[in-house]
């Protein structure tokens, strides 16, 4: 009815007057879209992703002996629909590499699995010398163990603190990485890599 319509317009007018542009705290903008513990699982990994930090919290995967059928070639990282992740801008012209958490070289058993490792949800800001050095060497060692002794379960936990660096682009740089290995005999090893 016309009376109801006038009533709604009157309420809207009062609301707009109360929330003028000089009153910033009246109508806060709340972003309900950023999640701190988004669980993503596929045939390669299970991951807890933090959209506020634009980095993983942790990731789990298993390295197995396999026949290589795919090669990374010119594959590059891609964004996931409806997930706020880091992107190419976070890695441009600085010392940070796009560090695979679940390594591409451990999932060349199929093109589909290899491609999944190039999602930005599987990527962390990792100092270049670490990514290309000790981190890569341990990935290769784990593959070697999987070939000779059976599957190796891997869990990586990213360490953040109140003093973690936040880039101008908004992504948070991990302070370090814990890598836990569990072998077929249930023995375990843990490594810590400072970032």
Task: Name these PLM-found stretches.
Residues 39-97:
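Short, His- and charge-rich active-site/binding loops that engage polyanionic ligands
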Residues 20-22:
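Bacterial signal peptide processing site
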Residues 81-195:
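Domain-level detector of nuclease and nuclease-like folds
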Residues 35-37, 44-49, 169, 178-182:
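Short, surface-exposed beta-strand/loop micro-motifs that present aromatic residues
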Residues 25-42:
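Post-signal peptide N-terminal segment of mature Sec-exported envelope proteins
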Residues 16-18:
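C-terminal motif of bacterial Sec signal peptides marking the signal peptidase cleavage site
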Residues 5-11:
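Sec-dependent signal peptide recognition
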